[in-house]
Curated annotation (Swiss-Prot):
PTM per Swiss-Prot/TrEMBL: Cleavage at Asp-270 by CASP3 (mature and uncleaved precursor forms) or granzyme B (GZMB) relieves autoinhibition and is sufficient to initiate pyroptosis. Palmitoylated.
Residues flagged as site, Cleavage: 270-271
Protein name: Gasdermin-E
Cross-link (Glycyl lysine isopeptide (Lys-Gly) (interchain with G-Cter in ubiquitin)): 120, 189
Gene: Gsdme
Length: 512
């Protein structure tokens, strides 16, 4: 809840900026100015960097010398208040991007979210540089040695943080609906934050977390470039990147690099930057289609029973955000060859049922578990299959809030293959014809409404006309359309045979 609330806050006040949201409330006390933070570089363009707060400061890892005494500037940051629409009946409407979508909505109530007045503390960077000018990094420091073992992490120093000034409560509101004649139920979650003026908290069954005043909800860092002899530089300019000077280039994955290089997405722009489309709004989809057919080939050659089992586990994961985050962390650590405390903690927080699903998924994609739970003693028996699964999971984990719920609903409705066909057709000229037999399931108004909401979460606005649909990109970025294309392609590869059987069965019984 806390992670989602802080993430939503930054989307509104610092979209595309340099601030980082705090993911765990327990990390708030660790976030002191000049604390060390590691930034884990990711492999694919849509993956956001991961950050870990270390139990050390910059002073702790420097050689002896003049003690760092940072000059701290404190100021008002912003008074954060946000209004959103919640629907008070079972049927849900939703507002995504610039498009308002309603499927049987029966009234809207306006809710209010607020962290209240926020304060910013910031280090005087120029003074810090002067104080550290003759200092070097102690490369024998235990903390530094552990960071170097990770091979693809950047050492950073915390230079600013954003804090609350009053007590807040974070609540989660679950909205439910039944659609398509009761065939499926959809539950979407919204996070609401309320600041309390006098310190009192109103009891509410939806309140799940209370955060005190002076809680850090976001922070800013500055990367360091550390040379082999311990000399280091502060990376002040936008294009200047930190890291460690190595005698030889190290691969960013621990497993067979060839298993990962088959995924042809390494030369695209960083996930935080927009990819402008000049040759059509869904040009990136057309570019990626052939690559994805090759990338998901290991799924295509699996035995039908294994395909179906993997697809069934994935359906559970799509409706369980906590399980998806834990699975992505585990896959990330397996690929990196070094288990992190985040993976261990994520698995410990899972229920027995969630752990069973996580274990089942890993075993189905070529991961051999030696003990009771996944751990560093395990090994990957089929690297291409595991790389393919990690590729899909990484894309699912980067989908916006509630998008995986809509995707899971489409799996239940057996329309994944239709959605792939729809996306391909739209990538040609932004318009598709519903006379195409593969698109027949989408002629249903309620099914199309769910598809609209899924596509809107990927910044694609679908407009339905009498016998066709038209697509418009909502933002000048192709990252979310690319992620949607990857997830649909992976799920379609696993479910295609099953959906074809259902389609043939439907025709045999005279159903549409």
């Amino acid at each position: 809840m806390f992670a989602k609330a802080t993430r939503n806050f930054l989307k509104e006040v610092d979209a595309g900026g340099d601030l980082i949201s705090v993911s765990h409330l327990n990390d708030s006390d660790k976030l002191q100015l000049l604390s060390l933070v590691t930034k884990k570089k990711r492999y694919w363009c849509w993956q956001r960097p991961k950050y870990q707060i270390l139990s050390a400061t910059l002073e702790d890892v420097l050689t002896e010398g003049h003690c760092l005494s940072p000059v701290v500037v404190e100021s008002d940051f912003v008074k954060y208040e946000s209004k959103c629409e919640n629907h008070k009946s079972g049927a849900i409407g939703t507002v995504v991007g610039k498009v308002k979508l309603n499927v049987g909505g029966k009234g809207v109530v306006e809710s209010h979210s607020s962290f209240g007045t926020l304060r910013k503390q910031e280090v005087d960077v120029q003074q810090l540089i002067q104080d550290a000018v003759k200092r070097t990094v102690n490369m024998d420091n235990l903390v530094l040695q552990q960071v170097l073992e990770s091979r693809n992490e950047v050492l950073c120093v915390l230079t600013q943080k954003i804090m609350t000034t009053q007590k807040c409560v974070i609540s989660e509101h679950v909205q439910s609906e039944e659609t398509c004649g009761g065939m499926v139920g959809i539950q979407t979650k919204t996070i609401q934050v309320s600041a309390t003026e006098d310190g009192t908290v109103t009891t509410d069954t939806n309140v799940v977390l209370e955060i005190p005043a002076a809680t850090t909800i976001a922070y800013g860092i500055m990367e360091l470039f550390v040379k082999q002899d311990g000399q280091f530089e502060f990376c002040l300019l936008q294009g200047k990147h930190g890291g460690f000077e190595h005698e030889r280039k190290l691969d960013s994955v621990y497993l067979d690099p060839l298993a990962y290089r088959e995924f042809a997405f390494l030369d695209m722009l960083d996930g935080g930057q927009g990819i402008s489309s000049q040759d059509g709004p869904l040009r990136v989809v057309k570019q990626a289609t052939l690559h994805l057919e090759r990338s998901f080939h290991p799924f295509a050659v699996l035995p039908a029973q294994q395909q179906r089992a993997l697809f069934c586990v994935l359906q559970k994961i799509l409706f369980d955000e906590e399980l998806l985050r834990a699975l992505e962390q585990v896959c990330d650590d397996v690929a990196g060859g070094l288990w992190s405390s985040q993976a261990v903690l994520a698995m410990e927080e899972l229920t027995d049922s969630q752990q069973q699903d996580l274990t089942a998924f890993l075993q189905l994609v070529g991961y051999r578990i030696q003990g009771e739970h996944p751990g560093p003693q395990d090994e990957v028996s089929n690297q291409k299959l595991f790389a393919t699964a990690y590729f899909l999971v990484s894309a699912l984990a980067e989908m916006p809030d509630n998008a995986t719920v809509f995707l899971g609903t489409c799996c239940k409705l057996h329309v994944i293959s239709s959605l792939c066909c729809l996306l391909h057709a739209l990538s040609d000229d932004s318009v598709c014809d519903f006379h195409n037999p593969t698109l027949a399931p989408l002629r249903d108004t309620e099914r199309f409404g769910i598809v609209q909401r899924l596509f809107a979460s990927a910044d694609i606005a679908l407009e339905r006309m009498q016998f066709s649909a038209k697509a418009t990109i909502l933002k000048d970025s192709c990252i979310f359309p690319l992620i949607l294309h990857i997830t649909l392609s992976g799920l379609s590869t696993l479910s295609k045979e099953h959906e074809e059987e259902l389609c043939q069965s439907g025709h045999a019984t005279g159903q549409d």
